[in-house]
Amino acid sequence: MKTSVLFVIFGLALLLCLSFAAELEDTGRQCGEFMWKCGAGKPTCCSGYDCSPTWKWCVLKSPGRR
């Protein structure tokens, strides 16, 4: 039982560290990808994406979109 609790705690700690590292990598980008917050003061969307005027995040370009 104690071993199981330790595995859960270490697993959660590892997950937290990995998500933190991924977040640091994302903030180093010069443009936003899918579901990235965009708008005033934020990086522009990468090529192939547009900033949604409604939701203010990067979405895939579509032929019908202005």
From Swiss-Prot:
Signal peptide: 1-21
Expressing tissues: Expressed by the venom gland.
UniProtKB keywords: Disulfide bond, Ion channel impairing toxin, Knottin, Secreted, Signal, Toxin
Matching InterPro entries: Huwentoxin-1 (IPR011696), Huwentoxin_CS1 (IPR013140)
UniProt-annotated location(s): Secreted
Disulfide bonds, paired cysteine numbers: C31-C46, C38-C51, C45-C58
Main location: secreted
Family, as annotated: Belongs to the neurotoxin 10 (Hwtx-1) family. 29 (Jztx-13) subfamily.
Name assigned to this protein: U10-theraphotoxin-Cg1a 2
